[in-house]
Amino acid sequence: MSGNTGERSFADIITSIRYWVIHSITIPSLFIAGWLFVSTGLAYDVFGSPRPNEYFTESRQGIPLITGRFDSLEQLNEFSRSF
């Protein structure tokens, strides 16, 4: 025999007007806040990722690709100096 926890059923919740009044405001506002977070560039600043125009600088236009098998440490040091 199962007991009653006193909680409302899911169907009862999503058919109530109160649910839709609350969520018709919060869901679009979360979408707009996320869009503004990304479109203003604040996401780049918060997470520290480079902006699309900062991947390649004027001095370094090539891809930092390690080609040597035995001198890879020297190439890594060279790449890290260019940053």
UniProtKB/Swiss-Prot annotation:
Gene Ontology molecular function terms on file: electron transfer activity; heme binding; iron ion binding
Bilayer-spanning residue ranges = 21-35
User: What cellular component terms from Gene Ontology apply here?
Assistant: photosystem II reaction center; plastid membrane; thylakoid membrane
Subunit text: Heterodimer of an alpha subunit and a beta subunit. PSII is composed of 1 copy each of membrane proteins PsbA, PsbB, PsbC, PsbD, PsbE, PsbF, PsbH, PsbI, PsbJ, PsbK, PsbL, PsbM, PsbT, PsbX, PsbY, PsbZ, Psb30/Ycf12, at least 3 peripheral proteins of the oxygen-evolving complex and a large number of cofactors. It forms dimeric complexes.
Classify the source by domain of life: Eukaryota
Q: Can you say what this protein is called?
A: Cytochrome b559 subunit alpha
Q: What is the role of this chain?
A: This b-type cytochrome is tightly associated with the reaction center of photosystem II (PSII). PSII is a light-driven water:plastoquinone oxidoreductase that uses light energy to abstract electrons from H(2)O, generating O(2) and a proton gradient subsequently used for ATP formation. It consists of a core antenna complex that captures photons, and an electron transfer chain that converts photonic excitation into a charge separation.
What's the protein's topology in the membrane?
Answer: Single-pass membrane protein
UniProt cross-references to PANTHER family, sorted A to Z: CYTOCHROME B559 SUBUNIT BETA-RELATED
* Keyword Flavoprotein part of the UniProt annotation: no
Ordered alphabetically, the record's keywords are: Electron transport, Heme, Iron, Membrane, Metal-binding, Photosynthesis, Photosystem II, Plastid, Transmembrane, Transmembrane helix, Transport
Pfam families, per database record: Cytochrom_B559 (PF00283), Cytochrom_B559a (PF00284)
- Where is it localised? Plastid membrane
The cofactor remark states: With its partner (PsbF) binds heme. PSII binds additional chlorophylls, carotenoids and specific lipids.
Organism listed in the record: Cuscuta reflexa (Southern Asian dodder)
| Cofactor(s) this protein requires | heme b
Task: Name the SUPFAM superfamilies on file.
Answer: Cytochrome b559 subunits
